[in-house]
């Protein structure tokens, strides 16, 4: 099943808003076996939207649109849809009731503009947007077998018309996500295969999509490719390997588009693991914080953090997981040296001699917070995130990280590069802190 996304809104094309919707939708659609072939962004402009719809329907079986469903004059998507599908707006009593209920505690939000939200295209199937006023609209061929209208004048044959769907979604990210999860994906799952599939689509076996992801760190991408070259060359043509490096972690994603079974792709992975064992983080596509949380809970152990240059970012990542209170005890944000000495017990002479950004300082920070909060593990960070503060000996991007464990304390210096922005440096520091922690806990993770 081929799909395309059209994102609608001037704000996307002037850089005011980043399109996060498409990335999220692409991942969800892929999980459902729906192949996304193209993403297009257009202005809030009638002609642009009509052209984008016509082009998308020439290629795809399902077209998703996001944005332009609000009540203001610049929100024209609903009106353009009416023109495209040859229909008109009518009042929907259920949508009206929903909107009144939505705003029952905010009566000032019910006005003549809000009232336009319960006007919907007559031929559309309407799905409820539980958290917003813009209903989800689904367009397809009519019960009479009428084909889609085409603004370019190109007739759509009956085979095309019987399979094409357009699903118009709100552009507000949290509304779109809830709409997809609660309404759109269940709708697609229950809509008949005959209604969704054209005769020229791929067979069921060919439509099967299987993904497996392996997390690797501590090796450059090029070196990894050389290491597994022989294994990669032996993969069947139905399995595609992608290298996806980001923030010091390489995701090896194996994708099967065909009749390869899960057992077959898992068998290939089993032969890969011994080759990359020195660099293996996890055998599933999990976040570092998920892996850390799982390992600590499995072992009944706890952790604390002492942060200088990362300023609480490490703490925020660790406690972002549900149930993290069972293993994450707390943090000391020791940005000023007085906090390092008075709370964490870093020796003043250490700071005077070696400086705040040094191996000895982060070791004492990690040991200090581990003792203070009575945890099994502790991580400490201290560095120069920039853009100022660097020296010849300690340039911007220099970060020391220490790990205090039941077996002792280790520290490592990282150079993330002076050209990176401050946020990038602190983000990399958090990533490396967790990567090294995972390897100390257990270098292979698979969550069942």
Predicted regions and their residues:
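Flexible gly/pro-rich beta->alpha loop and the following alpha-helix that scaffold active-site loops
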Residues: 66-91, 272, 276-283
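Glycine-rich beta-strand-to-loop/alpha-helix junction loops that act as flexible
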Residues: 8-10, 65-73, 170-171, 257-258, ...
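An accessory alpha-helical subdomain
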Residues: 164-268
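Glycine-rich phosphate/diphosphate-binding loop of Rossmann-like nucleotide-binding domains
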Residues: 2-39
């Amino acid at each position: 099943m081929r799909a395309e996304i059209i994102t609608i809104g001037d704000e996307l094309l002037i850089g005011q808003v980043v399109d996060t919707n498409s990335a999220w939708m692409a991942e969800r659609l892929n999980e459902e076996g729906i192949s996304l072939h193209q993403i297009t962004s257009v202005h809030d402009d009638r002609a642009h939207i009509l052209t984008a719809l016509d082009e998308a329907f020439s290629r795809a079986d399902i077209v998703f649109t996001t944005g332009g469903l609000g009540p203001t004059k610049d929100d024209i998507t609903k009106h353009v849809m009416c023109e495209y599908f040859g229909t008109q707006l009518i009042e929907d009593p259920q949508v009206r009731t929903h909107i009144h209920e939505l705003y029952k505690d905010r009566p000032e939000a019910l006005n003549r503009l809000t009232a336009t939200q319960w006007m919907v295209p007559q031929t559309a199937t309407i799905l409820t947007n539980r958290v917003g006023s813009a209903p989800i609209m689904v367009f397809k061929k009519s019960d009479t077998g009428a084909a889609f209208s085409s603004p370019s004048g190109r007739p759509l044959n009956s085979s095309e018309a019987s399979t094409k769907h357009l699903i118009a979604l709100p552009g507000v990210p949290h509304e779109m996500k809830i709409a997809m999860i609660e309404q759109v994906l269940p709708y697609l799952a229950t809509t008949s295969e005959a209604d969704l599939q054209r005769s020229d689509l791929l067979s069921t076996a060919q439509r099967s999509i299987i993904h497996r992801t392996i997390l690797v760190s501590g090796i450059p991408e090029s070196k990894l490719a050389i290491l597994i070259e022989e294994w990669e060359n032996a993969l069947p043509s139905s399995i595609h390997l992608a290298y996806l490096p980001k923030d010091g972690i390489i995701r090896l994603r194996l994708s099967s588009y065909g009749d390869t079974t899960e057992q077959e792709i898992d068998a290939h992975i089993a032969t890969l693991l011994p080759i990359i064992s020195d660099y293996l983080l996890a055998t599933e596509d999990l976040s570092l914080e998920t892996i850390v949380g799982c390992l600590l809970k499995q072992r009944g152990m706890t952790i604390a953090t002492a942060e200088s240059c990362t300023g609480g970012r490490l703490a925020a990542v660790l406690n972002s997981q549900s149930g993290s209170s069972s293993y994450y005890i707390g943090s000391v944000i020791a940005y000023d040296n007085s906090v390092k000495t008075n709370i964490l017990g870093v020796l003043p002479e250490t700071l005077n001699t070696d400086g705040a950004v040094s191996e000895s300082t982060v070791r004492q920070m990690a040991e200090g917070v581990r003792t203070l909060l009575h945890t099994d593990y502790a991580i400490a960070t201290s560095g120069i995130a920039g853009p100022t503060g660097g020296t010849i000996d300690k340039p911007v991007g220099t970060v020391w990280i220490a790990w205090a464990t039941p077996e002792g304390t280790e520290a490592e210096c990282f150079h993330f590069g002076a050209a990176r922005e401050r946020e990038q440096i602190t983000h990399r520091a958090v990533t490396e802190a967790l990567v090294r922690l995972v390897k100390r806990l257990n270098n292979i993770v698979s969550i069942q």
